[in-house]
């Protein structure tokens, strides 16, 4: 719904000509790190707060004042836009520090494009050069700092499908990953729990919006969408500094670059776009620190590709990305975001699974017809939601119908089939381009390589979670024992492992050698030597008679683990002739 608030916009700019960023405070309160910002506009004042919860694995006291001032000030610069938009003042006065001309251009661009939807739905006509100007009370410009960061990762979790795909792929590839959540809720915590991540292991920011802003919204002051992902970007720098982690891996896909309104540079997802990501990386490197590596891990992928990967994970019943139902932690089933999620997953999940996840078959709900047409590109704009491209939506629907022709009788799919473009998409059977990683991204080469082996990495993530809580002993150090050790060190590089063998010469050689196994504890295979072990990984060279002391429930093997992971994908081939030929043929077919 487009409102005509252009008159109100002009009146408020005249009545409230200057918005002030007075300053900020921060400190440790009851063990947590708190920061409060002070904004003023006329008779109105706002004091939004962030509380970073104390955790055992990091410290708030390792950063000096210069580092904290720099990071906190910049969080305030993005926080203020949520309050400025109520008045749209002509000037923003920054009282404690100054910005050079390039910094001003950076912030003006974020504010203008990040508020593109806000201006559009309020019927406000303005341009990037005239909508706001900066003024300063002081001349000091904060200098960039160096930070002592390690080669480890942070993955922000939003509760939807994208962030858990990033989490599992990076985790399965052996990366040291911590999750980060702003204002934890059911879905975000459930996704972490499903990944065997406890609440104590999560980086948390409790962000509080000043209640007076909500009062102004109710009174009719200007209101609308703000660039939350830009807030996440600047806040993530703080938790990265606190936890000494260099890499901040967002989960914004290539589809986020598409404009929401045809013919206009208005993008609901601007702060998820590659343009914003590149601008942010440049700004951080020059004005904050070159030590941070902020990037979107899923940037090379389409929504369809992500949905396909997600369908192979075990988060279907805990993920939720419905904004309308977020407070109740549900899929509302009545909004464009729910319909898009249903559509994009429909080629990859069975109908009964989708009904269990969303509470109903959304393709049968005629009340969603308008949203369907908007998502498919019928009309001047897509819904103002984080949804995929028009092309992806149409390809997903066509894939669903080809996979299940009977579904064409469902109300929304019947409607889609009557659109003039439907035949084109149904005839387009070559969709490989939707599942080919793109080259325009900021990933490190080692992280980009993960997509070439995504399925095996997903299975490695499952295996890692299956074994991460165990104290493991590998029984036997022949060929299979060494391959087991290499696999476990690949997926769990910091796990303490034990290798046991009945050959004392093998044990003694490895106990004294300075080789790649120097982090492994080697022991002689005998009873009473493994009281702390919870899982024994047996190899073929160790006879059962030699390990009678091992309880059966604690015993496993490579074959056992393989079948636990791949039982649904295993085809057994036997016979005296043609096994290798048949195997090769089946491999090519399936």
Language-model-derived ranges and their functions:
Residues 486-489, 528-533, 540-590:
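Phosphate-binding loop of NTP-binding sites
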Residues 2-37, 44, 286, 290, ...:
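ATP/NTP-dependent adenylation/nucleotidyl-transfer catalytic domains that generate, transfer
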Residues 1-152, 164, 169-209, 244, ...:
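RNA-binding accessory domains that recognize and position tRNA/RNA substrates
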Residues 184-186, 479, 503-506:
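Helix N-cap at the beta1-alpha1 junction of Rossmann-like dinucleotide-binding domains, i.e.
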Residues 172-177, 490-496:
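Conserved S-adenosyl-L-methionine
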Residues 495-511:
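NAD(P)-binding Rossmann-fold cofactor-contacting core
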Residues 55-64, 183-317:
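ATP-dependent adenylate-handling ligase core
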Residues 156-159, 471-486:
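Glycine-rich adenosine-cofactor-binding loop
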